[in-house]
Amino acid sequence: MSTAPTAPTVAELEEQERRLVFRRFTNDDAWALGSLLVELAREREAPVAIDIHRAGQQLFHAALPGSAPDNDAWIARKRRVVERYGSASYLVGSRFRAKGTTFEESSRLDPDAYAAHGGSFPVTVAGVGVVGAVTVSGLPQVEDHRLVVEALERFIGE
């Protein structure tokens, strides 16, 4: 029996985005959210890099043991998808797959610059819209996505 997490549906991913909205998002919020992600990743001994951007500025970055420079490249590629589409990188990739194609085949975007793989989630502020992205890289894409969502659920629920 497989213990791999089941991939969420497009509807489930869209519901996460509707739910996980901030009232505001400050530099201090980025630090607190990033620190929570580090704590969750350390509990799991996850070899990840974590990044939070807002309005083109990096507000938080951490590279945990076992992560590599490639994780930073993946972070940039996933974040660009969020910035371009205004949706989670995993949701964007899932929408392409639901249409019987892939992001790489059909987006017409450079795969060296964009990756619609799980792990980058929009920072959305109520009444404003998407202002940034929180991104994790180092695990399989479903797990990267789930780690970010878990942190957002805990943080926004506080």
Swiss-Prot record:
Lineage summary: Bacteria, Bacillati, Actinomycetota, Actinomycetes, Kitasatosporales
One Pfam family cited in the UniProt record for this chain: HbpS-like
Organism domain of life: Bacteria
Family: Belongs to the UPF0303 family.
Protein name per Swiss-Prot or TrEMBL: UPF0303 protein SCO2848
Gene3D superfamilies, sorted: Haem-degrading domain
